[in-house]
Curated annotation (Swiss-Prot):
Binding residue positions for substrate: K238, K457
Free-text domain note: The Asp-Xaa-Asp-Asp (DXDD) motif is important for the catalytic activity, presumably through binding to Mg(2+).
Transit peptide boundaries: 1-59
Gene name linked to the record: CPS1
GO molecular function per UniProt: copalyl diphosphate synthase activity; magnesium ion binding; terpene synthase activity
Species in which this protein is naturally found: Salvia miltiorrhiza (Chinese sage)
One Pfam family recorded for the sequence: Terpene_synth
Its biological purpose: Involved in tanshinone biosynthesis in hairy roots. Catalyzes the conversion of geranylgeranyl diphosphate (GGPP) to copalyl diphosphate (CPP).
Protein name as it appears in the record: Copalyl diphosphate synthase CPS1, chloroplastic
Necessary cofactors: Mg(2+)
Amino acid sequence: MASLSSTILSRSPAARRRITPASAKLHRPECFATSAWMGSSSKNLSLSYQLNHKKISVATVDAPQVHDHDGTTVHQGHDAVKNIEDPIEYIRTLLRTTGDGRISVSPYDTAWVAMIKDVEGRDGPQFPSSLEWIVQNQLEDGSWGDQKLFCVYDRLVNTIACVVALRSWNVHAHKVKRGVTYIKENVDKLMEGNEEHMTCGFEVVFPALLQKAKSLGIEDLPYDSPAVQEVYHVREQKLKRIPLEIMHKIPTSLLFSLEGLENLDWDKLLKLQSADGSFLTSPSSTAFAFMQTKDEKCYQFIKNTIDTFNGGAPHTYPVDVFGRLWAIDRLQRLGISRFFEPEIADCLSHIHKFWTDKGVFSGRESEFCDIDDTSMGMRLMRMHGYDVDPNVLRNFKQKDGKFSCYGGQMIESPSPIYNLYRASQLRFPGEEILEDAKRFAYDFLKEKLANNQILDKWVISKHLPDEIKLGLEMPWLATLPRVEAKYYIQYYAGSGDVWIGKTLYRMPEISNDTYHDLAKTDFKRCQAKHQFEWLYMQEWYESCGIEEFGISRKDLLLSYFLATASIFELERTNERIAWAKSQIIAKMITSFFNKETTSEEDKRALLNELGNINGLNDTNGAGREGGAGSIALATLTQFLEGFDRYTRHQLKNAWSVWLTQLQHGEADDAELLTNTLNICAGHIAFREEILAHNEYKALSNLTSKICRQLSFIQSEKEMGVEGEIAAKSSIKNKELEEDMQMLVKLVLEKYGGIDRNIKKAFLAVAKTYYYRAYHAADTIDTHMFKVLFEPVA
């Protein structure tokens, strides 16, 4: 098929660099004050916009050109020209070699491994490489812990553990002394620390290590300081609540911190050991268990772990489930997942292999599962067509109706509940557990935001509150891919995000600056092309006299934005332009049909003229002279001329059906749009029987029904304040919700006889209708600016 993008852009004066100042202005909605300077002789086209009187620079349009693989001339911003293949290849390699997951070493866990005595009875450590790791990794201030981010809980628990390990073997007394000094000077900071950032089990393991230090004769530690006494008090209160009988029977989170507990029945606990020999993937807990039991499986887990990390031990291992799930999530939200589809498929296959009816944990084959990993896994697998039973979430629903990350959780944190909220939105009909989850999660998160209690116990992320706030304001059905990507590029901190376990830790599969750099580069490249296409769309608007039909430039911008925010890829110009033009041409013809002066004879004449266009032969210039009807037909004819013969034939048939419907007062814009997208994408080329397939017809009928309801709601919204109130009520209509759930089910499930890419077009179109009905006009204006014009920082 000849490239429509090549045809339309080569005809454009913008492409030929003969742009007049009048036709080249990037017209913005009335809410923006716009100024542009575009001269045909300028080498660098400078554009700027003022939003609320604040000057904002805009990605340049007149920039170096590169040629896309389809032959289209693509404008690139200067910063976006740099090669993206290297970061893509780096990320592909990262995903392909994930293995058990990449994670930073924990001094705390390494110290517990270093404390293990030689199994042959010699006077020395069984794992001297772990002791050496401690020696080599003391920080300049005498502490151990995350060097880039200070967290008092992390620094103190790491430092006391390393001090105890060194003293256990009476080595490096000067390092022990420096560590003790650090603890003395910083222990009072515990009184000021954020409770939400307390490392896992700190109140249990820190006192246990102090007792161990005292038994080793380490003097000068602040054993009796008020801060330490407060930790002891919290420990006593927690231990009173620990159901020791239950923890010996079923896997609980307490298996993660056995080294801080007393009076344990090891015969019972060994029955709860994971298949890999660990206790809930924790090297420190497993090291303590080995000290008490000399269990061979514990030993093998510890040895395998330190061999992997050159003597060090992370706070948890493996992290194969956690690493893969969050990597996919980050790549999707950043808008760059399309570069890694085979790798993502492999990652999800790995997750599916270890999925259970209890859910999943951060590491595979764990009997203990949590709501965070389970929610993320359920959502991502469902999005990719896996059959996942949402009733797995019942494992985390308490008797009072609340959901918890895991049983016995003391402080519920925002991030796991936010992932529950996100998962709950991919609901199929009849899935009441997801309705319960959505209601609970929404209320929980709203309350956290209202009370400014958004600090998280699992991750330190600067923009987490912004992310959650936006997620509540913009649910999945009312989110368009490029809008989500633009915001997430703004919020994603890359390596700046730090995770909280027993210690602070980092994971390159999740928090990676290369992800961020690639996302920004890709967005700039796409945005530059979108701006170039917008220039062409404005010229088309002028040359076709579209304004005469009561269609404003803002209407044109909205149509182009909806298309671009949904299908943004560089190579999909054909579909974007066809989407935007089809919406505008349909408005033109509808305007002509609705005029009081338009007779039935005029309507039939237009339909007959369309019939004179033979899709398998050259068009005959129908309708190039005359009034509004002729102008509308000429615009449609010109649109069809941009395609090869067979595509033109298919599109003409789609428009003929739509015009016949319009003549009878029941035009189906959504059907026209989805058919146009699938035709232009080549999904049904030479396979017209797909249009008659039962599944295709079911999708088409359901999408049309949904879009008609949403169009009515949109009309209500435009009637002022009362209309907006009515629209908010209407969009929560039970029938509409159930129809959307059914559409999501039909599109996402792998079952059926038609390609998923064909089905995705129906959901993409329906989501744009939902988006318009859901959001206020000012919000949409903001999104248009961010996606099309605001440069990536």
